[in-house]
From Swiss-Prot:
<dbReference type="InterPro" id="IPR013471">
    <property type="entry name" value="RNase_Z/BN"/>
</dbReference>
<keyword id="KW-0479">Metal-binding</keyword>
<feature type="binding site">
    <location>
        <position position="207"/>
    </location>
    <ligand>
        <name>Zn(2+) 2</name>
    </ligand>
</feature>
<dbReference type="InterPro" id="IPR001279">
    <property type="entry name" value="Metallo-B-lactamas"/>
</dbReference>
<keyword id="KW-0255">Endonuclease</keyword>
<keyword id="KW-0819">tRNA processing</keyword>
<feature type="binding site">
    <location>
        <position position="65"/>
    </location>
    <ligand>
        <name>Zn(2+) 2</name>
    </ligand>
</feature>
<feature type="binding site">
    <location>
        <position position="263"/>
    </location>
    <ligand>
        <name>Zn(2+) 2</name>
    </ligand>
</feature>
<comment type="subunit">
    <text>Homodimer.</text>
</comment>
<comment type="function">
    <text>Zinc phosphodiesterase, which displays some tRNA 3'-processing endonuclease activity. Probably involved in tRNA maturation, by removing a 3'-trailer from precursor tRNA.</text>
</comment>
<dbReference type="InterPro" id="IPR036866">
    <property type="entry name" value="RibonucZ/Hydroxyglut_hydro"/>
</dbReference>
<protein>
    <recommendedName>
        <fullName>Ribonuclease Z</fullName>
        <ecNumber>3.1.26.11</ecNumber>
    </recommendedName>
</protein>
<dbReference type="GO" id="GO:0008270">
    <property type="term" value="F:zinc ion binding"/>
</dbReference>
<feature type="binding site">
    <location>
        <position position="66"/>
    </location>
    <ligand>
        <name>Zn(2+) 2</name>
    </ligand>
</feature>
<feature type="binding site">
    <location>
        <position position="207"/>
    </location>
    <ligand>
        <name>Zn(2+) 1</name>
    </ligand>
</feature>
<feature type="active site" description="Proton acceptor">
    <location>
        <position position="65"/>
    </location>
</feature>
<dbReference type="GO" id="GO:0042781">
    <property type="term" value="F:3'-tRNA processing endoribonuclease activity"/>
</dbReference>
Length: 306
């Protein structure tokens, strides 16, 4: 089970209703952050998520509402005597910005910080991959994909019998090794299991205008978190942001399972935004508020930590 915890769902500046962007992915005892706007540390405290469990932070771009919470997080980790390394990823200039950021106060982290600048990259970890892709925001900016590894299918009794075998202790050995020899014949795991189960796929656009790369990287995602700062093109003007209609168009074309409309402009009250979005968007969507949680497995569940 993967949990997507919306720590901040607004854009541009914090309001009484919502904080600026930060999303926590809770998976296998690890916490990954997508963006870390100012006040994220307080949001983590509200949700009882431990900052010490954060392993990786992926920053989409260097506008303040997406990264200004980083300093307070690093300082708190140091006060709590963290020793484990922290990995920070971002677009071009990430190394320069983070290095300058860390020189802006009279403290030094108690742990190593590894900084990685990404283009369109695929990062492989034990149980999942994270892909980065370029978006259109007028400055170096990235979107991210979390792709859980596919899981092997269940043992198929019919396939086992067709090979003249019976279920037994050998199955555990095969599961560990991937192949074993039985009665002089080499048996592979895929010979006796069903179709692999697709791993969960989540996409986060960060700030962007509508662009084709989002559609390409989002195809058949379980969840697309698409910025939808404005309700209309008139409100949007010439900014490098998206409207609700544009986010819905992309989700429909990419055939995603669920769309989350994200990064609402401060001018909109939640009720107003929901009312207008329901008129505009014909696709299956949610409008998360701060502390909402989406749990993804074979189906999704929506709840709140408020």
């Amino acid at each position: 089970m993967l949990e997507v915890i919306f720590l901040g769902t607004g854009g541009i500046m914090p309001t009484k209703e919502r904080n600026v962007p930060a999303i926590a992915l809770k998976y296998g005892g690890e916490i990954i952050l997508w963006d870390i706007g100012e006040g994220t540390l307080r949001q983590l405290d509200t949700t009882k998520l431990s900052p010490m469990k954060i392993e990786k932070i992926f920053i989409t771009h260097f506008h303040g509402d997406h990264y200004l919470g980083l300093m307070s997080l690093i300082q708190t980790m140091t006060l709590w005597k963290r020793e484990r390394p922290l990995y920070i990823y971002g677009p071009k200039y990430t190394f320069e910005f983070i290095q300058n950021y860390l020189k802006s106060g009279f403290f030094r982290p108690s742990f190593e910080i590894h900084i990685h600048e990404l283009g369109e990259t695929r990062l492989k970890f034990k149980d999942y991959e994270i892909w980065s892709f370029k978006v259109d925001h007028g400055i170096p900016a990235l979107g991210y994909v979390f792709k859980e590894n596919d899981k092997r299918g269940n043992f198929d009794v019919e396939k086992i019998r067709e090979l003249g075998l019976k279920p037994g202790p050998w199955m555990k050995k095969l599961e560990i090794k991937g192949k074993i020899e039985i009665n002089g014949k080499l048996i592979y795991l895929e010979d006796v299991t069903g179709e692999p189960k697709k791993g969960v796929k989540i996409v986060y656009t960060g700030d962007t205008e509508q662009c084709e790369r989002i559609k390409l990287f989002s195809e058949r995602a379980d969840l697309l978190i698409h910025e939808a700062t404005y309700l209309s093109r008139e409100d949007k003007g010439d900014s490098y942001h998206s409207t609700v209609e544009e986010a819905c168009e992309t989700a429909k074309r990419a055939k995603v399972e669920l769309l989350a409309l994200f990064h609402r402009a401060p001018r909109y009250k939640y009720e107003e935004y929901v009312q207008e979005a329901n008129k505009i968007c014909e696709y299956k969507f949610i409008i998360p508020q701060d502390f909402d949680v989406v749990r993804l497995g074979e189906k999704y569940e929506l709840s709140s930590l408020r």
